[in-house]
C-alpha cells in the first residue's frame, strides 16, 4: 500500500507548518544533499566490495 497524492500533500503541509516558509528551502536543500551523499556512499560501497573479492 503506497502513499497516495492526498497523503503526500498532508505530509508536505505538516512539514510546512513545522518549519515555516522561511526555513523550508534550507530544509529541502539539506535533504537533497543528504540523499545525494547517501547515493554516493552506496555507489562507493559496492565498488569496495568488488575490489576485495
Curated annotation (Swiss-Prot):
The gene is tatA. Its main location: membrane. The Tat system comprises two distinct complexes: a TatABC complex, containing multiple copies of TatA, TatB and TatC subunits, and a separate TatA complex, containing only TatA subunits. Substrates initially bind to the TatABC complex, which probably triggers association of the separate TatA complex to form the active translocon. This is Sec-independent protein translocase protein TatA. The keyword Protein transport applies. InterPro entries: TatA/B/E (IPR003369), TatA/E (IPR006312). Part of the twin-arginine translocation (Tat) system that transports large folded proteins containing a characteristic twin-arginine motif in their signal peptide across membranes. TatA could form the protein-conducting channel of the Tat system. It comes from Rickettsia rickettsii (strain Sheila Smith). Keywords: Cell inner membrane, Cell membrane, Membrane, Protein transport, Translocation, Transmembrane, Transmembrane helix, Transport. Belongs to the TatA/E family. NCBIfam families: PRK01470.1 (NF002402), tatAE (TIGR01411). It is a single-pass membrane protein.
Amino acid at each position: 500500500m503506497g502513499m497516495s497524492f492526498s497523503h503526500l500533500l498532508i505530509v508536505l503541509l505538516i512539514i510546512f507548518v513545522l518549519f515555516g516558509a522561511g526555513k523550508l528551502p534550507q530544509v529541502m536543500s539539506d535533504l537533497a544533499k543528504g540523499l545525494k551523499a547517501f547515493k554516493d556512499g552506496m555507489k562507493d560501497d559496492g565498488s569496495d566490495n568488488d575490489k576485495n573479492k
